[in-house]
Amino acid sequence: MDISISWVVIIVFVLSYLILMDKWRASKLPGNPPPSPPKLPVIGHLHLLRGGLPQHVLRGITQKYGAVAHLQLGEVHSVVLSSAESTKQAMKVLDPTFADRFDSIGSQIMWHNNDDMIFSRYNDHWRQIRKICVSELLSPRNVRSFGFIRQDEMARLIRVFESSEGAAINASEEISKMSCAIVSRAAFGSVLKDQGKLADLVKEALSMASGFELADLYPSSWLLNLLCVNKYRLQRMRGRLDNILDGFLEEHKVKKSGEFGGEDIVDVLYRMQKDTEMKAPITNNGIKGFIFDVFSAGTETSATTIQWALSELMKNPEKMVKAQAEVREKLKGKTNPDVADVQELKYLHSVVKETLRLHPPFPLIPRLCKEECEVTGYTIPAKTRTLVNVWSIGRDPAYWKDPDTFNPDRFDEVSRDVIGNDFELIPFGAGRRVCPGLHFGLANVEVPLAQLLYHFDYKLPSAMTAADMDMSETPGLSGPRKNPLIMIPTIHNPTS
């Protein structure tokens, strides 16, 4: 009995202490904090994140409490931005203040303590690798130079679709293979023998690293960090990934050039690594981190966007007919169309923009507020974790008529682009941390999509109708489809 009473006293004492600490932290919030839902002791608002994908749940919270909302997730204070106005203020007016990333167990393990570009802190290392990326690796000129790779891999994909004419094909799987091959050849100068293993690892890592870890939300708890099972899974995965990348890089050092000669992305990184005048030397882990950036951001996002575009066109047959008519008229007689050719395809551009509006590659963009500031009149404390809900902004009726409807024609009336200038549509982010690979990514979406629409007509399997299509998403950094896209391709006959 005495032991039971002692435990009750201890539990009451601990809970009382945690509640008092919780109230003390809340009282320390400066100025005019953003509105916040009622919270529970110790866990704060964690219970509100149940029951759906994070971007969906957070949209419901900001619809109720305002476009700028404060959440306490465990010990961590976070702010969600779900309007173009608040996002513009954070990413443009206060860009240097919000240019940092916050650490997580997933990013630290998979990206070697954030020694890459996507998750690096805003510092000399990030500025340097960003400059290399923009001027050397993924510039518009280099994107055009990768045209022969896109053409080669598209020819392979077309052969696969032709061989499956009249039969159901897993379009998601084949498109992912094509996207991975393009990135592999651009990065390493050749198709990798373990390319499939690398692609599977990247997909699994993105899924695992995109969740909320309790150890991230209670950073003061060494016990939660110790008991974090996902951490050990990620460490094992990181080891497997290192083994593959180390092998690729060693092979790359001894070969003279890629399959088509000239410099690939790894060549440029090795050349820069030897530059003694660089402020922040590029390490081998930094090279592996950047390659992982290219594969994770370049492979998954491009493939996912093509899959969503085809899904939306299959679900909206009248839009499919219009897109195919434009492509077949403008590209008639062009055997190997590339970036310059698709510039003429106005409706295709609208299809891609509408797809990115409804299915952004990064539904939530993480930032860290470095110092206290004000966003739309609300005080944001220093070191506050910030999540920009790109998915929610793209479906906000304040900016978009019939926001849940796939309608590429809306861009005839609304002049908005995806490069970070229009904050109603920022699938690649905005400000100084806008995705440097957006030109590479768009080329790897628009060119393959145009050719798939040009060469084939499509039907759904068995008795499925457009209304039956499952458009559900699954958790992941790139917002992928829950189920693969299965279609029946038939070769287009211009005379029929």
Curated annotation (Swiss-Prot):
Gene Ontology biological-process annotations: terpenoid biosynthetic process
Cofactor(s) it depends on: heme
Nucleotidyltransferase among keywords: no
Assigned GO CC terms: membrane
Topology in the lipid bilayer: Single-pass type II membrane protein
Chief location of this protein within or outside the cell: membrane
Subcellular location: Membrane
Region ranges (Disordered): 471-496
Binding site for heme: 435
GO molecular function: heme binding; iron ion binding; monooxygenase activity; oxidoreductase activity, acting on paired donors, with incorporation or reduction of molecular oxygen
Pathway(s): Secondary metabolite biosynthesis; terpenoid biosynthesis
Domain of life: Eukaryota
Chain ranges passing through the membrane: 1-21
Use in biotech settings: The monoterpenic phenol thymol is widely used as a fragrance and a flavoring ingredient in food and cosmetic industries. Its derivatives have also several biological and pharmacological properties such as antimicrobial, antioxidant, anticarcinogenesis, anti-inflammatory and antispasmodic activities. Medical applications include the treatment of disorders affecting the respiratory, nervous, and cardiovascular systems. It may also act as a growth enhancer and immunomodulator. The monoterpenic phenol carvacrol is commonly used as a fragrance and a food flavoring ingredient and preservative. Its derivatives exhibit also various biological and pharmacological properties including antioxidant, antibacterial, antifungal, insecticid, nematicid, anticancer, anti-inflammatory, hepatoprotective, spasmolytic, and vasorelaxant. Phytochemical inhibitor targeting the main SARS-CoV-2 viral protease (Mpro) and ACE2 in human host cells, carvacrol is a possible candidate for treating COVID-19.
UniProt catalytic activity: gamma-terpinene + 2 reduced [NADPH--hemoprotein reductase] + 2 O2 = carvacrol + 2 oxidized [NADPH--hemoprotein reductase] + 3 H2O + 2 H(+); (4S)-limonene + reduced [NADPH--hemoprotein reductase] + O2 = (1S,5R)-carveol + oxidized [NADPH--hemoprotein reductase] + H2O + H(+); (4R)-limonene + reduced [NADPH--hemoprotein reductase] + O2 = (1R,5S)-carveol + oxidized [NADPH--hemoprotein reductase] + H2O + H(+)
UniProt keyword annotations, A-Z: Heme, Iron, Membrane, Metal-binding, Monooxygenase, Oxidoreductase, Signal-anchor, Transmembrane, Transmembrane helix
Enzyme Commission identifier(s): 1.14.14.-, 1.14.14.51, 1.14.14.53
Enzyme class: oxidoreductase
Family listed: Belongs to the cytochrome P450 family.
Function: Involved in the biosynthesis of phenolic monoterpenes natural products thymol and carvacrol which have a broad range of biological activities acting as antimicrobial compounds, insecticides, antioxidants and pharmaceutical agents. Catalyzes the C2-hydroxylation of gamma-terpinene to produce carvacrol. Mediates also the C6-hydroxylation of (4S)-limonene and (4R)-limonene to form carveol.
The protein, known as: Cytochrome P450 71D180
Species this chain originates from: Origanum majorana
